[in-house]
């Protein structure tokens, strides 16, 4: 579709109609699809993408596309570290309103998700899903190295450190590292004041922990 006044060509007739308004001298730019008017042609052109489905504005951080620049600008705040949503109770800030809503339940005690089996209530859907596995016996997380299965993803991740050799849990006293939190907890008892043999590791001699408690 070509403009008879300047010979500029367009793929769609609607684009040609938008362009012709530049030659008409009319200050009101009207959308041929919905009739909405704009003061500037650039605003009309941006608006027209809503009808064509064209995504022109792309987020540099994640590549997500938007039809309007204002929508992209609002989205980009999530990458800038800005946290515009503030909790009126404690002043903590959040990037998204949904995060604030979840946080506020710590103040209100609201637990909207209930287990139909036990009647227990939870703050988050994810907590309920984890809990329901205790009724079904489901263990969806399987170790590809040894085949051992786990109910919770956190337990699965901790188990995998046995195979990778990754030491994540570190003793704050002597900086010794462990693949499991339970092993770190057992080790830390050797640093306690009531341990008469601090040089002995309760992880090596598990019976010592019981002796000290008695």
UniProtKB/Swiss-Prot annotation:
It comes from Xenopus laevis. One of its GO terms (biological process) is regulation of transcription by RNA polymerase II. Pfam families: zf-C2H2. A zinc finger (C2H2-type) spans 1-23, 29-51, 57-79, 85-107, 113-135, 141-163, 169-191. InterPro entries: Znf_C2H2_sf (IPR036236), Znf_C2H2_type (IPR013087). Transmembrane segments: none annotated. This is Oocyte zinc finger protein XlCOF10. Gene3D superfamilies: Classic Zinc Finger (3.30.160.60). It is found in: Nucleus. GO terms for molecular function: DNA-binding transcription factor activity, RNA polymerase II-specific; RNA polymerase II cis-regulatory region sequence-specific DNA binding; zinc ion binding. Keywords: DNA-binding, Metal-binding, Nucleus, Repeat, Transcription, Transcription regulation, Zinc, Zinc-finger. PROSITE patterns: ZINC_FINGER_C2H2_1 (PS00028), ZINC_FINGER_C2H2_2 (PS50157). SUPFAM superfamilies: beta-beta-alpha zinc fingers. May be involved in transcriptional regulation. GO terms for cellular component: nucleus. Belongs to the krueppel C2H2-type zinc-finger protein family.
